[in-house]
């Protein structure tokens, strides 16, 4: 115990919660602190940008219910249509007088709920402790603009920058704005950039930059299709990245068929260019297609060769082991090496997965 001049102890540095679980639904219905002076998550609800009712956790400060989840380290703020370059940030998270936010903060509810889903995936599936694997909080800022892109209030983007998520918005024609915090795939994509930044830190140029983008696309699509089924059946997956966000209303990219968005799906079509840091958003589609192949390849019985949760873990372990200038071939070798280690002790399964990886990449010309 710390206090009255005593030194720190492990109880000061490690969060200890206990909880009660509903025996019928298996849902956590009540959290409580297992140590003194620890913030306890409070159950809340609210309407999000998609007009859906969402359940999430926050905390109570005085008479206010804040979008700060102390258990998952997810915090959500309103930037009030200010420039993301301004040094002054909101002093307090989005709050409400009741635990039911209703439709009073739809952008904030979407950001908070979706960041929680991504956080849960990182923690439960990848076994990663936050973005930096050291418990970094996921801080989201809604209602942002970037003055270098125009005076606003429209800012058609969402970005991981300065260790935070910044969400723009677009006018929907009825005097209101649709926040980019509604797009789970975009959020997962951007937060994966945070993992890349704090692990392999792939150089954002040429093939290493294309890998940087591809890993974000891979996890964006997997996480977007993970909930609520954890994962949902593969037959119903949406393989598009940013559906509806491209000019003309189409997707930004499509992992299942990159040619739908005019992008390459094979090394024969690799785009040699100095534009976009060596075509990072274009050539990433070749590696995206390889990942799609691996996610969907089946055995003779018509079953998935590698379940999506295992594919996600293999790619995560690969990402954290790459060097900064890694190219597509380096990634393939690292992925096979990770699979060897992961399936060590089961040689037949090891060989089966290695063959699946080799075939998935060979089909797009990566060797």
Where are these regions (language model features)?
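Zymogen propeptides/activation segments of proteases
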Residues: 1-187, 194-367
């Amino acid at each position: 115990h710390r206090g009255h001049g005593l030194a720190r102890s492990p109880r000061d540095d490690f969060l200890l919660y206990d909880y009660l679980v509903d025996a019928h639904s298996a849902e956590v219905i009540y959290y409580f602190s297992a140590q003194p002076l620890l913030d306890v998550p409070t159950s809340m609800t609210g309407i999000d940008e998609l007009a859906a009712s969402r359940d999430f956790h926050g905390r109570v400060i005085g008479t206010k219910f804040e979008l700060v989840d102390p258990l998952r380290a997810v915090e959500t703020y309103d930037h009030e249509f200010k420039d993301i370059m301004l040094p002054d940030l909101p002093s307090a998270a989005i709050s409400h007088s009741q635990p039911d936010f209703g439709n009073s903060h739809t952008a904030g509810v979407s950001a908070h709920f979706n960041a929680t889903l991504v956080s849960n995936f990182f923690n439960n599936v990848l076994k990663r402790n936050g973005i930096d694997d050291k418990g970094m909080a996921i801080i989201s800022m809604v209602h942002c603009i970037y003055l270098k892109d125009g005076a606003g209030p429209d800012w058609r983007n969402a970005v991981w920058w300065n260790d935070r998520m910044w969400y723009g918005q677009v006018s929907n024609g009825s005097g209101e704005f649709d926040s980019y915090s509604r797009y789970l795939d975009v959020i997962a994509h951007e937060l994966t950039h945070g993992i890349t930044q704090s692990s392999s830190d792939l150089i954002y140029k040429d093939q290493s930059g294309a890998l940087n983008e591809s890993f974000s696309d891979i996890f964006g699509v997997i996480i977007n299709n993970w909930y609520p089924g954890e994962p949902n059946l593969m037959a119903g997956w949406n393989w598009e990245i940013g559906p509806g966000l491209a000019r003309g209303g189409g997707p930004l990219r499509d992992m299942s068929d990159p040619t739908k968005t005019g992008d390459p799906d094979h090394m024969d079509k690799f785009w040699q260019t100095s534009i976009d840091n060596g075509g990072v958003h274009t050539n990433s589609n070749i590696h995206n297609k390889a990942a799609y192949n691996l996610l969907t390849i089946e055995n003779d019985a018509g079953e998935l060769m590698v379940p999506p949760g295992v594919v996600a873990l293999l790619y995560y372990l690969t990402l954290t082991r790459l060097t900064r200038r890694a190219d597509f071939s380096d990634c393939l070798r690292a992925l096979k090496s990770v699979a060897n280690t992961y399936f060590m002790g089961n040689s037949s399964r090891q060989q089966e997965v290695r063959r699946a990886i080799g075939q998935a990449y060979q089909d797009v010309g990566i060797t």
